[in-house]
């Protein structure tokens, strides 16, 4: 019996090293199932040098990982410190040898093994200048490991952020995938979107036509709990918020027919202990129940105020049993009933356009605004001199990872659908960019819905700024877990209005006379809607606009037909004209 067992083990080890052409490829859906729950070997090869951030890799780690019950290991790797800065951008052979040794340790234990490019921020800092070097690095990685089994998975780039744009990320994914496919035609490759692999950015991810792709996102929300040790976690609303995010990702995955890998998630060691265990348990369960694979982040660091995020002690070879159990077992620390499925909001008839303007805030009454900030950023607000009488003065000091903002607590839960624009007077101590943010209402009490923003470049003298609501874009650096995922700015459910940070700079802002702007009053009954220019707005205009939408060669007055003044003539204008004629 012992001989048979030894033979089986030997065969499995040999098969893990067989090249893909011999062993056979595995499609991405099956690969994600095979990956199951895994862990990261963090702070090892993603450090400037191995051992500078955490203990160097040891073969026994993989024995311990396997005994614990993990199915895959993600090995983050920083390549730039081991690559020539100039052409031909050769990767140090000794470093490649070391990486191959560790990959083989992992593969020989039967792990699906993920390697990536990690902390290579030089590419993000100047994409157009550095993409050539990045291509050469991946060409060497792909060539070196082309003979490994299908259990080796490539991940192109960890957490794109900073200067790199969505279009550049999509271009990079296509370029690197083409390079990989020259030597690894069927190997599974993981691609991700921007803003630190945010789930919010998945909608911006262009998916190449390739059957062996896996999409990734990372999850550390709520950040104030997982990284800043603030408060506790584990209420019904806390869990519902995470479930909404994973539902959102699952819908995106199904729509785009691509499986999903939650490549990182974790909580710093100084967070509330009971909450941390419960958070690991719930997030792991949500990932698996949605059909994702997931890899918990572990960096081997214990006791550090800034970097403690580990559950495996590399010296004692002991796991934090509570965290390990929470990650690998289902629902042992929490009770949760999924929220009742709610139907999406029914189709709405567009509101009848408003005319003129409505002043909503002149700062002449009691103070209704409040400041908020965190992570070394600060903000305060007070009533001060405005453009006309009183105004709001905002003093802020940003930080590289911090946030600040001021929120209007009076005008919450508003319906602004009939308005076209928002207007305000603004003056700044400098020309630093700030953002105007409108948060939608949410179906979860106490939570925001989707965030929509517009970047303001204020002057140092009083200026009136008018912003069409159609110019707002979905916030990409963060979205509340309770967002509805509609990708539509729903003005009929405005939750709150904010002025907030756009970068880490500091300064002072003065705000006055916030207004909602409708159609020009001189156009009432005159031009807007008079599609045939006969001086009347009637059923003839309605019929003519309908014909135009079916055949754009028909002659109409396009200025008058653009009912909502967004520059396009479409079904929204048709619906708004109908409401005008009905007098609603």
UniProtKB/Swiss-Prot annotation:
One GO BP annotation of this record: cellulose catabolic process
UniProt pathway annotation: Glycan metabolism; cellulose degradation
Domain CBM11 as annotated: residue spans: 354-584
Reaction catalyzed: Endohydrolysis of (1->4)-beta-D-glucosidic linkages in cellulose, lichenin and cereal beta-D-glucans
Keywords: Carbohydrate metabolism, Cellulose degradation, Glycosidase, Hydrolase, Polysaccharide degradation, Signal
Keyword Signal annotated: yes
Location of the Dockerin domain: 524-584
EC number(s) from the headed UniProt entry: 3.2.1.4
Residues annotated as signal peptide: 1-24
Region of interest: Catalytic: 25-328
Gene Ontology molecular function: beta-glucosidase activity; cellulase activity
UniProt keyword annotation of Ribonucleoprotein present: no
InterPro entries assigned to the protein according to its UniProt record, in alphabetical order: CBM11, Dockerin_1_rpt, Dockerin_dom, Dockerin_dom_sf, EF_Hand_1_Ca_BS, Galactose-bd-like_sf, Glyco_hydro_5, Glyco_hydro_5_CS
Described purpose of this protein according to its UniProt entry: The biological conversion of cellulose to glucose generally requires three types of hydrolytic enzymes: (1) Endoglucanases which cut internal beta-1,4-glucosidic bonds; (2) Exocellobiohydrolases that cut the disaccharide cellobiose from the non-reducing end of the cellulose polymer chain; (3) Beta-1,4-glucosidases which hydrolyze the cellobiose and other short cello-oligosaccharides to glucose.
Alphabetized PANTHER family for the sequence: ENDOGLUCANASE, GLUCAN ENDO-1,6-BETA-GLUCOSIDASE B
Family classification: Belongs to the glycosyl hydrolase 5 (cellulase A) family.
Protein known as: Endoglucanase D
Organism: Ruminiclostridium cellulolyticum (strain ATCC 35319 / DSM 5812 / JCM 6584 / H10)
